[in-house]
């Protein structure tokens, strides 16, 4: 299994099988019980790298960093090998550039790649990001 993780406050974890096929996507609040069950089968995980963004408040920047640290701790505790990946690196070649990269094109791409994934709503852009990160993880770390 391969994991893609969007560590945002409303982030998600996506799971792909060894063939790169969709298994599930789990919202942040529900992750801990799922990762306990999956940990032994995970080959590799990619965690989106976080950094302060212009216009982002101090509190939200802190929360974003705190969530990233939480994820790193969970992955290490369950002995899941992982790397961090910059948004530009996982988006390259997957998300079409329309001026500035936005979350909506990523959602559209993920819906096409993973039609069985629950990505019905616009607010599911974090799930979409996690799926695309998992896709890159599978491509780079798989077989």
Where are these predicted regions, by residue range?
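Phosphate- and other anionic-substrate recognition elements at nucleic-acid/protein interfaces
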Residues: 1-143
């Amino acid at each position: 299994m391969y994991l893609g993780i969007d560590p945002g406050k409303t982030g998600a974890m996506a799971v792909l099988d060894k063939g790169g096929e969709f298994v599930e996507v789990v919202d942040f609040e529900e992750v801990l019980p799922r990762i306990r069950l999956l940990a032994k089968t995970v080959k590799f995980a990619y965690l989106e790298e976080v950094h302060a963004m212009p216009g982002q408040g101090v509190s939200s920047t802190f929360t974003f960093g705190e969530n990233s640290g939480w994820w790193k701790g969970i992955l290490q505790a369950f002995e899941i090998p992982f790397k961090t990946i910059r948004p530009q690196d996982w988006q390259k070649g997957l998300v079409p550039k329309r001026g500035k990269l936005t979350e909506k094109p990523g959602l559209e791409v993920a819906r096409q790649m993973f039609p069985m994934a629950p990505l019905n709503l616009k607010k599911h852009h974090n799930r979409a990001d996690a799926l695309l990160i998992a896709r890159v993880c599978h491509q780079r770390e798989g077989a």
